[in-house]
Amino acid sequence: MSKKRLHEIAKEIGKTSKEVVEKAKSLGLDVKSHASSVSEEDAKKIVSTFTEKPKTETKPKIKAVDETPKPKLEAVKEEVKVEKTQTVQETVNPTVARPKSRNFKAEREARAKEQAARQKRNAQESTERRQDNRYQQKNDQGSKNRNFNKSQGQAKDRRFDAKGSQQNNRQDSRIASNKPNHNDKFNAANRNQNNSQQERQVGAARIDFKARAAALKAEQNAEYMRHKETQLREQEEARRLAERAKEEARLAAQKAAEEKAKEAEKAAKTERFEPKSAVASTVAPEAVKPVDKRRKKARPEKSYEDQSSNENGPKQNKKSWNNQNQVRNQRNSNWNKKPKKGKNAKNNTVAPKPVTERKFHELPKEFEYTEGMTVVEIAKRIKREPAEIVKKLFMMGVMATQNQSLDGDTIELLMVDYGIEAKEKVQVDDADIERFFEDDTYLNPDKLVERAPVVTIMGHVDHGKTTLLDTLRNSRVATGEAGGITQHIGAYQIEEAGKKITFLDTPGHAAFTSMRARGASVTDITILIVAADDGVMPQTIEAINHSKAAEVPIIVAINKIDKPGANPERVISELAEHGIISTAWGGDSEFVEISAKFNKNIDELLETVLLVAEVEELKADPTVRAIGTVIEARLDKGKGAVATLLVQQGTLHVQDPIVIGNTFGRVRAMTNDLGRRVKVAPPSTPVSITGLNETPMAGDHFAVYEDEKAARAAGEERAKRALLKQRQNTQRVSLDNLFDTLKAGEIKTVNVIIKADVQGSVEALAASLLKIEVEGVRVNVVHSAVGAINESDVTLAEASNAVIIGFNVRPTPQARQQAETDDVEIRLHSIIYKVIEEVEEAMKGKLDPEYKEKILGEAVIRETFKVSKVGTIGGFMVLSGKITRDSNVRVIRDSVVIFDGKLASLKHYKDDVKEVGNAQEGGLMIEKFNDLQVDDNIEAYIMEEIVRK
């Protein structure tokens, strides 16, 4: 459906766009301006509203105009009245009466109306001729359209007859309901054409656009003059008010000056007997300045708008500017300059803005400060100006600027001067992770739940510790899981009676000691395993001492009760001597007799562990952010830094920002002891994580932070402190410990791990290796045990950079594979002295080699040859020995060595040779030396390595 714009409709019906827009709004149409579009039906409605009303009103008026022609001026007035009566119901701008004082305007309007009346008659005749031509063209076009529509209708009837009756009925009903009949449309079109023709004829006879334009212009001029008069009255009123205010201010100042003069005179009279009375009486009147009334004379102030305004007419078109002084040329560049603004303006009547008074703020009663606050920060806190504080500090003897930091004492003195109580703010060190392990006030007491105990098995070598761990791992870990453990991460969990127990697979008590040294008391219960046939051994006593230092309960597992020589009672009595007393004897330590090899009483041992854990009341809060300890850490080629963590409090989630030791990162992936991916790790759960930027140390604490930014800041701060501490702990060499330091730095060690078939062989081999004496090197037995070489031995050897020595034993397939992967050397022997020789050779290999100089021969230069782009060639004769191609040479001149280097080339005549023998001649070139002279001596030598004994 085509649309029409409102200004097109207004042009067709001879109305203004504003009237058409208002009429469309009155009909409820959504239009905004003359450019809005409406449909054809809405356009017809708008046209009909304008055409229906004037039919009865305009005809007699048109006839009256035709029958009795009136004078031109009266005809124009009557047409204006007709237009007013027609637009009573419409919304138009009200006409304003012209001011009577402006006679020249009435004359100008009359002349304009007369001219419009003359033009009207001429335009009316031409308009009628154009309309007749247009109507004739439309009638011709309408006949063509009717013939075409008639043929189209016949074709459509033929198509409709070919379709089914149901479609015809539906089509007929739709046509009947929505669209009028074709004949009705044609008749309506003819009626609309006739109506529009009549309207145009009426409009042509009724509307005079130029007369209306003249009337509208007159109304606009009248409106402009009223606005100008109002503006002038307001300006005049503003000037009167300003003058009145100035006069009042002048009178008030004059009155105040007079009162001050009277007071001065009165004071002078009361003090006339004093010696200074005369001076006072003469000085007081001088304070009153005479008022210059000439400067206060009221002068007419003209604004910029007054320059172009006239009292008897509208605004002039700047004709007064085109004078001799306002020529636009190079000599006068200010021809279009606007009046000045600001304090230099001559006619500035705008009163200055009053200065806003600063609000008074009371001082706070307390002030919480931090060390290093600046003056500006303090000023903002106490609502004072920084300059005021700087002044106070200056009076206190402290020279400071606004951005200078102040110490705590200065801030306290400043607050005392202001009368404010100063308190230092207690700052929490975000980089301190240890506070979470020392203070548990951050935990929620009402959300504490029971957690699984963390157990460490300790004991002497060959007492069954490894066997017990293997038994627990194979029989209890992942019951019902296919494949069992798929990844060994140094810690694992077992389940007994519906409760979990976490075991730490640490390589002996050494790792436990290193953890304790870092303050990581991760163990809740210690299982001390003692062999029933051996009893208490030295390492057993050491394990007892470590457990007591960690303040953890001890459960004694007496192993190997299946052996014939087992004597559990002797073990109980020996342990009682070291402070481990059984509950049967009135002590607090539980004793369990087991056989790890045959899986005997293992259930009873686990029940005892759960009983002790229940007595200890191990609790944890899973709602807080996770903290814990690093069990193991390694650098994987594909994953990067991998750390095995034990969660002690809170719950660890994937994507948590974490700080571990002196490093930080985000938990990218997390796997449990079965090697499966998990997203959540509750308390007492061992997990392996990735996503750290560096590899942490075993035993380091970790904590989860609220966001990655805080974690990064804490990690970087901890790394900075660790580096500073390392530099501070650097021992400086003094004269007292100079030689001790040199000796300690020179001594090197060879780390070995000994595994043998029997205990006697282990002790004998360890004693023999410790007796080997090589200057500057010593043997360090990292670990010695009985049995085959297993995975734990390979792991320990990799961590300590040790060599595994197997005496009459072989490594397991898993250990051999791990040794190849970790590049750990395994030496297998069956004769003890071969072991000693091999270790001795390794110890000698640790020493730095010693070299001795050996003179090969001497020669003398007989002639020199300088070759461009090559250098100086020396012809020589061998005096003694020989000169070889790979030997070092010294150039000696007058018994002084002037150069020491290597040969670049050696020739015998024209052939390159490897050596030149005694009494032979040859030629040579020396690398980076071209200053050979005749009679220079050449000494050839080599450095030989001395065998260390």
UniProtKB/Swiss-Prot annotation:
G5: region residues: 595-597
Regions of compositional bias (Polar residues) in chain numbering: 144-154, 164-180
Domain of life where this protein originates: Bacteria
Region described as G4: 559-562
InterPro entries assigned to the protein according to its UniProt record, in alphabetical order: EF-G-like_DII, IF2_II, IF2_N, P-loop_NTPase, Small_GTP-bd, T_Tr_GTP-bd_dom, TF_IF2_bacterial-like, TIF_IF2
Residues annotated for GTP binding in this entry: 459-466, 505-509, 559-562
Molecular function GO labels: GTP binding; GTPase activity; translation initiation factor activity
Residue ranges of domain tr-type G in the record: 450-619
Region G2: start-end pairs: 484-488
Entries under PROSITE patterns matching the protein: G_TR_2, IF2
Compartments (UniProt record): Cytoplasm
G1: annotated segments: 459-466
Amino acid composition bias (Low complexity), ranges on this chain: 187-206, 319-336
NCBIfam families, per database record: IF-2, small_GTP
Similarity comment: Belongs to the TRAFAC class translation factor GTPase superfamily. Classic translation factor GTPase family. IF-2 subfamily.
UniProt-recorded name of the protein: Translation initiation factor IF-2
Organism of provenance: Streptococcus uberis (strain ATCC BAA-854 / 0140J)
